[in-house]
From Swiss-Prot:
SUPFAM superfamilies: WRKY DNA-binding domain (SSF118290). Residues 86-137, 248-287 are annotated as: Disordered. One of its GO terms (biological process) is response to water deprivation. Residues 122-132 have a biased composition (Basic residues). The lineage of its organism: Eukaryota, Viridiplantae, Streptophyta, Embryophyta, Tracheophyta. Pfam families: WRKY. GO terms for molecular function: DNA-binding transcription factor activity; transcription cis-regulatory region binding. Keywords: DNA-binding, Nucleus, Transcription, Transcription regulation. It is found in: Nucleus. This is Probable WRKY transcription factor 57. Residues 141-206 bind DNA.
Amino acid sequence: MNDPDNPDLSNDDSAWRELTLTAQDSDFFDRDTSNILSDFGWNLHHSSDHPHSLRFDSDLTQTTGVKPTTVTSSCSSSAAVSVAVTSTNNNPSATSSSSEDPAENSTASAEKTPPPETPVKEKKKAQKRIRQPRFAFMTKSDVDNLEDGYRWRKYGQKAVKNSPFPRSYYRCTNSRCTVKKRVERSSDDPSIVITTYEGQHCHQTIGFPRGGILTAHDPHSFTSHHHLPPPLPNPYYYQELLHQLHRDNNAPSPRLPRPTTEDTPAVSTPSEEGLLGDIVPQTMRNP
């Protein structure tokens, strides 16, 4: 009966029997080993210092059927370095991942921090200008800028098409007033001045207007509204009055009867009696 603790290794079927290799077999394995190592770029020679290497190789050949490679201790360090280099080359994803890590980090940081928004200039919408009513007046005058009771500031002038006379632009000097006016002479009749007003004044006049501009307005309403003294009468009225007085003085006046002394009572001349004459009557002073 076979003892399970002590198996019989003398049987031919045992996989653990010791094989004795001939010199021809050892040369065969040496050639295969050198060929395999030369494929990897290793020029290694079989060392006779390790007699058990052939035995180990023979056992692996019998059990697995794969040709073993014998590596001596002298080349163990160089083989380890070569294997490490080979493993690094066989795994490029690790190297690429390590090199791509900074790029991924920069991309992540870029995603976290939003790009600075460029300031958009707010375009102010131009308010539509309300068209003011216009009034035009034609006046015969030698002066272009007629007096109308307001103060104006000239801010522009330009030539008029088909007219030798330029057009002047004025603006009211009051900061709250938006009234404008244009002054130009007529190309047909140079003696006529065309004044065009745009808008209405929101303030009182500066002073009493000069010239004959009052003919277009009621003088009584103007003076009552602005509390100004009434306008003087027509100067021709004084001239007529003076002529009438002159004629009256030159005309012969009728002779009046001279009054007589009998008709007129005697007027007592006051005497210098002082205060006594005022207090004491004359009958008491002259008995």
